[in-house]
Every structure is written in structure tokens, then in C-alpha cells.
Amino acid sequence: MPDELRLFLKERFGVQGPLSPGRFEAELAKRLGSPARRAPLLKAWRADLAQGGREAVRSFYREGLNVTKAEALVYGMHHPHLEFYAKELPPRVEGRVLEVGAFTGALVGFLQRKRPDLEWHALDGVEEAVALGKKRVPEVAWHLGWAEEVELPPFDTLLLLSVFPEGLVDQGLESRLAPEAFWKRFAFFERLPLFARLLRPGGLLVYGHGPFLGKSPEGVEEGLRRLGFDRVERVGEGEYFLVLARKPEALAAVRLEEREAPPPEEAEEVAVALEEARALLEAGRYAEALALLPEEAEGEAAYLRGRALFALSRHAEAEEALR
């Protein structure tokens, strides 16, 4: 499967292989020597990293399609996740399938080749990406628009892969977030229902966080359950995971409780304790980390307590802490 995907990406999209996001600017300079030609794309890239938002995302991808070979670099940064998706998705998807944020169609095009028996659709909010996608991957039906707003008949499978966090991530964000921090950071309970409009009741939602910071597979799983999704399951671990779930007839309304902010001195003490607990967990000193985290812990403290309990094989207590 990896070799088949790599050949497809190379032949249709000019992708040479994986590219670390930290190497994007250097690789762009290597492939496009003129500073003047790459300046607009670099400006859009840095704006996307610094401030995010829909317009920053649109600008980056639009400028990327105006620069020769930059499209391939974009796919290079997503390459390892594309390999993971290409391996795990074909046997799981069904019916009419929509990929949200398909860019120029590399993933949806490959999946269509693996499952030609299904009806494949691609959605993107960048007009230039859709126009090029129709040429690159004419085998799928293309739609222009942003998932939160577009009106389309509901699908049997909805793919939210490396798209939900985009535009809401900055370089100061932690790699992993506790569930509540994840819900707040990405406005999960406000935004997810807007995407889920495109999925029929009983249809399959597939969430992949992609190469972005702020991962929380536990947050995705618990968030979907709170919204009423059932048959929630996770595939993969660590950097590479998918969460699959079935949409209910009607989504539940979920509102996070607003907690009163603690006094500055107390907040500082809590922050220090959390930092120490994280360090102890990383060092494998689980019992010591647990001693810093009270049973009534909430938010990130509860998440860290659950991790410590799992590591100590106290699974029932861990599940209670992570609820």
C-alpha cells in the first residue's frame, strides 16, 4: 500500500516524499530560487502559522497553487498521515463518501481507486484547488464551499481528515491536549455539528487530526459521545489515529460549564503542580505523579491522573477519572 500510494502521488501530484513542516521554507527556497517569486507564499505560510483563521488558510493554499511545485510540498508535509489514511480507510468507508478539505484531491483520488464501487465526492473552500482537482482527479464529484456553510445532500460517510483543527493552531500550542482544553480550543461542540449536517443519521463520521498540534483522541471520542454519536471507536495511537462514530437521529446540545477562575496565587500553584506531574509521567514515575493529582481533579489534571492510573494498571479508576 505505501508504495502504491507513493507512486500515485508522484505521478499525479509530483510528490517526491515526506517533508517536515520545519523544512518547508528551506525546501521551497531550494526548488524555487527567486526570493521575489516565493515571497507571497512565505508571507501566507507565516500568517497561517501565526494567526490562522479561514482567510489565512485560504491565502496559503491559493498562493501555494500559484507557485510551481509548492502543491507537492503541501502534500509532502501531510505524507505520513496520507499513508495512514490510505491504509485504514478503504475497508471502512461506505456508500456516498465526502472528503472535507480535499485540496486538489490526492487522498480522495487514491481512495476512489481502491474502492471504485463507492460514490466519491470532494469539497474544498479554495476555488483554485477545486478547479485543479477537477483536472487532477476527474473520477470524483467536486464541490466548492466551506463545510460549515455549504448545502449538500447528506452523505453516508463523512471524512474530516487533517482539516478540523486547521486555522486554529499556532506554534505555542501543546502537542497533546486534555479533552476539555481540546473542546475549548477548537470550539468542538459549536463547530462539529456544522460539519455533521453533511452526514445522514446512521452515517459514518471519520475524524483524523493530522499533523497539527493540539491532538486529543480522548477528547474527540468523549465529545462525539456527548453529542449522541454511538459505536465510537479509535483506530491507531499516538500521532496517527482515527476516530469513527455513527451519527444519531438528532445531535444533543452540549455546553461546557464556565468555571470561575481561581485566584492568581492558586492558579500559579496549580500550573506548577501540573507541570511537575507531566514531567513525572514522562519519566515513568507514575505513583509520584498520581500523588500530585487529587481525586476531585478536573480538566487537564483529571486527564493526567487518568494517564497515571492506566500506567499503574488501575483501569477502573482511570476510566472514572477520564469521564
Task: Show where each model-derived region lies.
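Conserved SAM/SAH-binding beta-strand->alpha-helix loop
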Residues: 126
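A short acidic, Gly/Pro-enriched loop at the edge of an enzyme's catalytic core
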Residues: 150-158
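A short glycine-rich, Lys/Arg-flanked "PGG" loop and its adjoining helix->strand segment in the class I
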Residues: 178-201
